[in-house]
Amino acid sequence: MVQVPYSRITTLKDITPDVSNSKYVVYWCIAFKRTKYNFALQRAVEWANKLSQPLIILEPLILDYPMSSLRFHKFMMDGMKEVSETIAKTNAYYFPFIETEPKQSDGLLMELSKQASVV
């Protein structure tokens, strides 16, 4: 696999991941909801491989997007199904979370990150 170009990487917290107290790498999928041509996902895969830890892909779908509609949510869920089918062929774990009430996913990333080496 080709490495992510350095110009595409932004380090927010420059620390060495503590693999002794962590269980996985988390990729928070909120913008580029695709498995190909996705530098962020590629970088998460690189980290998971480097640390020999499983990759969890978290993709939340919240109810209160500005300008959201039933059509928008149908489109998003169709995409989630495609991503799920693609990820099922890999060693990663795909965790789609679809809110049934507004704000239901608040704190979800924070909770998963407690046991993550890299987010």
Q: What is the predicted role of each segment?
A:
Residues 1-118:
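Trp/Phe/Arg-rich N-terminal binding region typifying the photolyase-homology
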